[in-house]
């Protein structure tokens, strides 16, 4: 499971659309999204309610405590909303120690209300927890002792008996309505593969639940079965995290292929760089470097898997090598080309792309004093490793090559020994 945060606009869009599908009832949620590409005149034409009602506007940037930070404006007309957005769009703010520009806003009707309730559903390995409180809103943390929580093991149904502790203290006139709302939201949570869904607060409008503020996370590994349900979903980067051009390039490659190609720069001046086959293996290699005390020297996180084509590996390897060899400073560096034992990926075929990239970047590798460490196993691995050994002689770059007889992460220790001995 990969938990990915989505914008409030998308959370509300999914809840509104699928609440009706699953319950037959309409949630009167209305909201629009504004970013730098939005034509405000076209937006008002498409959503006439924007010009006839009082509005709420706030950043939609995956961070909380917007109200406490003075980033929520209430009871505005649309002209005031436009001014609010213009004054803040692209401006940098700091939230919980993270700095970044505000790029996206959500606008919705202002809903006068007295009651504020809290609802949260979150999944973990063993099941789902559902939390509810009659004291929701911006002071929820101060009133956490009033939050009630139940746990449902995986596969269990949310029956009235199980739900009863959550709504036990509600007035009778609203108890059934809120209980039914919680049950539908839980069904929707599972149906859409949410991993986290929080409404803080939701209120009652004409006796029916109405979510005012919402946060959501989806299991993005379930995208293959939910692409129609999710629609045009966006998984934004965490607030304060901006992709570099090289990361954006790899992200574009990843979106176009059935394989997996991941790349994140951790420290541009790092002296240990990785290019690892397999999602699990890539994390193990990175953790091993950290466990050995050299996390500060780890330049990147990189993972390729799912039998990428040779040309895809070539483009991917070019980017990794360019970053690993940038700005040579006379200090030695290490490139770890690792992986476990593949099940179906042709090791020699994927190595072909890496070898082509290494040949192209021969001069850069030498200028950066790069030492390469290789460890791999799987189909056709002997041929792939033989090509790697021959490559070292061809381009005059030191390459240490190991097969499955060596421990998977042993080359991490060798890489560290190399950069420290040559320092």
UniProtKB/Swiss-Prot annotation:
Q: Its gene?
A: ACLA-1
Entry comment describing in which tissues the protein is expressed: Expressed in trichomes, epidermal leaf cells, anther tapetal cells, stigma and in young vascular bundles of expanding leaves, cotyledons, roots, pedicel of flowers and siliques.
List of residues binding citrate = 343, 345, 376
Can you name a GO cellular component term? cytosol
Q: Which domain of life is it from?
A: Eukaryota
Q: InterPro entries under this entry?
A: Citrate-bd (IPR032263), Citrate_synth_N (IPR056749), Succinyl-CoA_synth-like (IPR016102)
Query: So what EC number does this one have?
Result: 2.3.3.8
User: Per UniProt, what is one GO molecular function of this protein?
Assistant: ATP binding
Q: Does the keyword Nucleotide-binding apply?
A: yes
How this chain assembles, per its entry, is:
Heterooctamer of 4 alpha and 4 beta chains.
Q: What further fact does the record state?
A: Plants silencing ACLA-1 show a severe dwarf and dark-green phenotype with some seedling lethal plants, reduced leaf cell size, altered cellular ultrastructure, altered plastid ultrastructure, hyperaccumulation of starch, increased accumulation of anthocyanins, chlorophylls and carotenoids in vegetative organs and decreased accumulation of epicuticular and cuticular waxes. These phenotypes can be complemented by exogenous supply of malonate.
Q: What is this protein called?
A: ATP-citrate synthase alpha chain protein 1
Please name the Gene3D superfamilies in this protein's record.
3.30.470.110, Succinyl-CoA synthetase domains
Write the record's keywords in alphabetical order, separated by commas.
Acyltransferase, ATP-binding, Cytoplasm, Lipid biosynthesis, Lipid metabolism, Nucleotide-binding, Transferase
Task: Describe the reaction catalysed, as an equation.
Answer: oxaloacetate + acetyl-CoA + ADP + phosphate = citrate + ATP + CoA
Biological process (GO), any one: lipid metabolic process
- Read off the SUPFAM superfamilies from this record: Glutathione synthetase ATP-binding domain-like (SSF56059), Succinyl-CoA synthetase domains (SSF52210)
Q: What is its main location?
A: cytoplasm
Can you say where in the cell this protein is located?
Answer: Cytoplasm, Cytosol
Q: Its family?
A: Belongs to the succinate/malate CoA ligase beta subunit family.
The free-text function statement in the UniProt record for this protein reads: ATP citrate-lyase is the primary enzyme responsible for the synthesis of cytosolic acetyl-CoA, used for the elongation of fatty acids and biosynthesis of isoprenoids, flavonoids and malonated derivatives. May supply substrate to the cytosolic acetyl-CoA carboxylase, which generates the malonyl-CoA used for the synthesis of a multitude of compounds, including very long chain fatty acids and flavonoids. Required for normal growth and development and elongation of C18 fatty acids to C20 to C24 fatty acids in seeds.
């Amino acid at each position: 499971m990969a938990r990915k945060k989505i914008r409030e606009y998308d959370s509300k869009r999914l809840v509104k659309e699928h609440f009706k599908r699953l319950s037959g009832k309409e949630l009167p949620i209305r909201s629009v999204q504004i970013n730098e590409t939005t034509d405000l005149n076209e937006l008002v034409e498409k959503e006439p309610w924007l010009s006839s009602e009082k509005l709420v506007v706030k950043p939609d940037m995956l961070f909380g405590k917007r109200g406490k930070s003075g980033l929520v404006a209430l009871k505005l007309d649309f002209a005031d909303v436009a001014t609010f957005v213009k004054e803040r769009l692209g401006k940098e703010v700091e939230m919980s120690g993270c700095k970044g520009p505000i790029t996206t806003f959500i606008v919705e009707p202002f809903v006068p209300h007295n009651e504020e309730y809290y609802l949260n559903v979150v999944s973990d390995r063993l099941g789902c927890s559902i939390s509810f409180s009659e004291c929701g809103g911006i002071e929820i943390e101060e009133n956490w002792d009033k939050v009630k929580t139940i746990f449902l093991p995986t596969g269990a149904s949310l029956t009235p008996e199980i739900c009863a502790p959550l709504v036990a203290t509600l007035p009778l006139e609203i108890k059934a309505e809120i209980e039914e709302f919680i049950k539908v939201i839980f069904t929707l949570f599972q149906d859409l593969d949410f991993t986290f869904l929080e409404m803080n607060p939701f209120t009652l409008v004409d006796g029916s639940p109405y979510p005012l503020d919402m946060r959501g996370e989806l299991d993005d590994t379930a995208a293959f079965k939910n692409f129609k349900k999710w629609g045009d979903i966006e998984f934004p980067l965490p607030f304060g995290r901006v992709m570099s051009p090289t990361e954006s390039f790899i992200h574009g490659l990843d979106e176009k292929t059935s394989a997996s190609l991941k790349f994140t720069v951790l420290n541009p001046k790092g002296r240990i760089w990785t290019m690892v086959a397999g999602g699990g293996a890539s994390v193990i290699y990175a953790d091993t470097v950290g466990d050995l005390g050299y996390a500060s020297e780890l330049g990147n996180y990189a993972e390729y898997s799912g039998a990428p084509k040779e040309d895809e590996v070539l483009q991917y390897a070019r980017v990794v090598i360019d970053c690993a060899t940038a700005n040579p400073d006379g200090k030695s560096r290490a490139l770890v080309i690792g992986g476990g034992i593949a099940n179906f990926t042709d090791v020699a075929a994927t190595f072909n792309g890496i070898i082509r990239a290494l040949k192209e970047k021969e001069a850069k590798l030498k200028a950066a004093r790069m030492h390469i460490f290789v460890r791999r196993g799987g189909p056709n691995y002997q041929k792939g490793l033989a090509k790697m050994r021959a490559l070292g002689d061809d381009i005059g770059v030191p390459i240490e090559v190991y097969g499955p007889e060596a421990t998977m992460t042993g080359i991490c220790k060798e890489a560290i020994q190399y950069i420290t001995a040559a320092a």
